[in-house]
Amino acid sequence: MKKYCFILLACIVAVSCGEKTPREGVSLQLANQRKAFISNIEYNLYFRIPENRQESLRGRVDIGFISSKKANVILDFRASEDMIGDVIMDGNRVEYRFINGHILIPGKYISVGENCITLEFTPCDGSLNRSDEFLYTLLVPDRASTVFPCFDQPDMKAVFALTLDIPESWKAVTNGMDETCQPQTEGEKRMVFKATQPISTYLFAFAAGKFETVSQTHHERTLTMFHRETDKEKLERNTDVLFQLHYGALQWLKEYTGIPYPFGKLDFVLIPGFQYSGMEHPGAIFYNDSRLMLDKNPSVNERLNQANLIAHEVSHQWFGNLVTMQWFNDV
């Protein structure tokens, strides 16, 4: 009997230690633990993006949330500890522990009700996909935490507001609508974007760089295409088709689901060398440019693939973005 009591005690201690010392990644245990007492999450993000890709980005995030109890709060940040700057609550620096890619804020700093944690950090370059003239994020399925501290699990949706300081000749796009654009220091400008509706961390995205834009308005909705295409004939040949396919998909899905497009604005970005055919970020779909900018006299299959890709990514705005799976195994 003593033997079994000892084993039971050891298991309890192990579980307790597991909660206090999170392992690498986001375990289902950690995800369920956070989801049970944290809600109403808001990320107010700021990044400064230097034109020289040899210079690191600087970042800051205000994470607002409601806590139903005083408990340790564990954020995900898959970087090294020296990439974390100040951690501030109520105007004061707070002590924290950095464990296996997590930032643990002790429960003594957490209030029942509203909380706000401000963190300064340096993002990892891996998920920023930087080149000399542009960069873009790709955070699926669980890579948001390589760019900024967050609760990186799909069922903890949050509101995102973004501010970017970028070179003055660059353009930028994200999930939310652009609100203001003001000159900053010499050679830079600040773009402030409106807050999104609640979305999962893997769906947050932005792109910035030397892009050109084309906009069209149909059915009282304006779509904007960001691109880097230099072949004017190819651009002219494909542009109207791409807009028609997006508008057609939006209209069909609205009629099919009975739900209007749920995310306000919708832009799409054609990116050279993008890793996937497309990625369905709400408000800012990213595509591999070669899949949509077709050469002269495309085959029937190429046209069908072009239309299928757009329909696929637009359908995700309802199936995946509006209604989202609970866990990573369904991403």
Give the role of each language-model region:
Residues M1-Y4:
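Positively charged n-region of N-terminal signal peptides that target proteins for export
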Residues A10-C17:
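Hydrophobic h-region of N-terminal signal peptides that target proteins for export
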Residues C17-R58, G85, N129-E133, P154:
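N-terminal, polar/Ser/Thr-rich
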Residues G59, Q153-A311, D330:
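Hydrophobic helix-coil surface modules that form long, contiguous segments used
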Residues R60-E81, D152, V159-P167:
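Surface-exposed beta-strand/loop patches in extracellular or lumenal glycoproteins
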Residues R78-L135, T185-E186:
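A surface-exposed beta-strand-loop module
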Residues K108-K171:
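Surface-exposed, acidic/Ser/Thr-rich flexible loop segments
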Residues V314-N329:
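Catalytic Zn2+-binding segment of zinc metalloproteases
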